[in-house]
Amino acid sequence: MSNITVNIKRLDPTVELPKYAHPTDAGLDLRSNEDCVLKPFERRLVSTGLAIALPDGYAGFVQPRSGLAIKQGLSIVNTPGLIDAHYRGELKVIIINLDPSNNIKINKGDRIAQLVIKEVPTVNLIEVEELDETDRGNGGFGSSGVA
């Protein structure tokens, strides 16, 4: 497992810094920096009170927490949310209540998402007239079966 150093800034001194729940987890828990109630199918931009400086060649991916998704229907609208290395603004999460009938209460300090930081290559695109053939070809969207 490789390690990188990421600078993080508390925009609110009361905010808890993200951490891994377990040493081998991929995602750092992000917490809400505000109280809110989401009605069924309502979405909201939620503050975390944090800003980060990712190293060049890395990106952050904000993803839902599986327990909140299955138990309450809380998800993230633009899953995964992308944080580019040159972004220095506040980390915010666009959450949505997918439960058809129940409100979801979010308290300041609740874990609402996970931040996964990954190395990302810079890609050089080369335009060609034809692509190489594969067994799959242009089959997609269920072409390999559903069971």
Region annotations inferred by a language model:
Residues 1-147:
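DUTPase catalytic domain/fold
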